[in-house]
Design a protein with these regions (language model features):
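FIC/Doc superfamily catalytic core
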Residues: 1-130, 134-196
């Protein structure tokens, strides 16, 4: 059988998706509290309490990180934790503006691009000490559910290319590399499903 942690992680993720879908159907506006609530569901059984010089925070409650984080061991550092709250507020405001436009003028391609950009930006902010990848994919799918789109996924064998695309977007300070990767990935997955 699978390790217990993985089972708990998947159970938590399913509950987070259930909540996300309800909020997507209600067209609930994005807010820092909403993101923290979803993160608390994602990390419910695998998160933990951290005691740092900056104070205590609990990843199982969706608390934003109060420490620096890097991509893997010895990887590049994500933004300073002090910048996270304001960047997350800006993120919510920007996403809400684009959501409002889409509600008035629905456009599937623009909705997909919004979902990919939200994913990309959330990874770059890295608001939590753990679960950022799961949250970024959840938020991408959340926006796709909200606008009635077929949800996109990244298949296991494309994981390296997915990480490369995220890195390219960050290095070039452009949404394009990740948008192109995700559009290609989504098209490929849809074609494969049609063939099956």
């Amino acid at each position: 059988g699978r390790p217990m942690v993985e089972q708990l992680m998947n159970l938590d993720l399913k509950r987070a998706y259930d909540q996300s879908i309800l909020w997507a159907e209600e067209h609930k506006a994005f807010s820092v509290d909403m993101l923290k609530s979803l993160s608390a569901l994602v990390m419910k059984n695998t998160g933990s309490l951290y005691s740092t010089l900056q104070g205590d925070f609990d990843s199982s409650k969706g608390d934003l990180r109060l420490v620096g984080v890097t991509a893997g061991s010895g990887g590049r550092s994500y933004m300073n934790y002090l910048k996270v709250p304001s960047r997350l507020t800006d993120f919510c405001n920007a996403i809400n503006q684009r959501r409002e436009i889409l509600m008035q003028h629905p456009n599937d391609i623009d909705a997909y691009l919004l979902s990919f950009d939200a994913h990309n930006i959330l990874v770059a902010i890295h608001p939590w000490v753990d679960g950022n990848g799961r949250m970024s994919r959840l938020i991408m799918n959340h926006l796709q559910f909200e606008f009635g789109l077929v949800p996109s996924k990244v298949i296991t064998e494309d994981k390296a290319a997915y990480i490369e695309a995220l890195n390219a977007s960050r290095e070039e300070e452009s949404m394009l590399p990740f948008q192109c990767f995700m559009l290609n990935e989504h098209t490929k997955n849809l074609r494969a499903e049609i063939v099956e």
